[in-house]
Amino acid sequence: KTRCRANLKRLLTPRHIAFVGGKAVEDCINATRKSGFTGQIWAVHPKYTELAGVVCVPSLADLPEPPDATLIAVSRERTLDVVAELNAMGAGGAVSIVGEFAETGEDGAALQARLVTAAGDLALVGPNCLGVMNMFDGMAVWGGDNVFSPVMGDGVALISQSGYVAYSVTNVERALPLGYAISMGNQAVLNVADYIDAMLNDSRVRSIGLYLEGIVDIAAFSVAAMRAVKQGVPLVALKAGGTQESAELAQSHSGTLAVDNEIWSALFRRLAIVEVGSPKALIEALKLLGSPKPPKGNRIVAAANSGGYAA
């Protein structure tokens, strides 16, 4: 995965972003502009002459050079062809926002396996995801409108298996210096360990939040988590699937197999990962642990102006 991980860096800090799809990509193009991206924006469509004010070229082969980042918003079958072509031309990374892959059953899982083969060294995020944003540098390859708040100096990162959880956290105005947000989706090519490593390669990241429905590679996840411990970057995890019903929903949502939450909690304790029980707690923990001088121990005093709130 060495080259794939190098391409992930290109995806997160692109010089140019290509958009492949019809009218659905117009909101995505506008989101990229809104994020503060100052690089080149390209649109690819065989019939449209322009999308969101960007002149279209009919094919990827007509682009000036291989794009560092690409947002793909075409059918799942067509996605395979686009991904294969991007890999062949030496593109950096891509975000596939379309679903109906492994999360839908055996047929979708088979199609996703073909997608992985087609991707090769391409840093593919998704499928079935919302995208990535880097607000340290002003960039988003994102599946729609969002709040994009620039981060000056150090900040935190969010890696989420749910697009909606990523969307919700990134749109919360709670003084959270969110430098990176990554919606992983099905983790077909890149998984949570790859994203953690990418965040740890950026010294501006002080803490990393995780929303997980499952982990595809426990060994790689453990290695990445221990690297975070060594670098002094706290990991905060919110795990879905606390009940049988929610575990089954997680499986249908992102193709994740259900595992007893007590097992996950034991793993988190072993890897010094802070576990929280709600999105709000995830946000507040990230704010605390991402501060310039996070607490070194567990001796914390809380002060409140009401006995009821304190209780």
Where does each model-flagged region fall?
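Catalytic-core regions of core metabolic enzymes
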Residues: 1-311
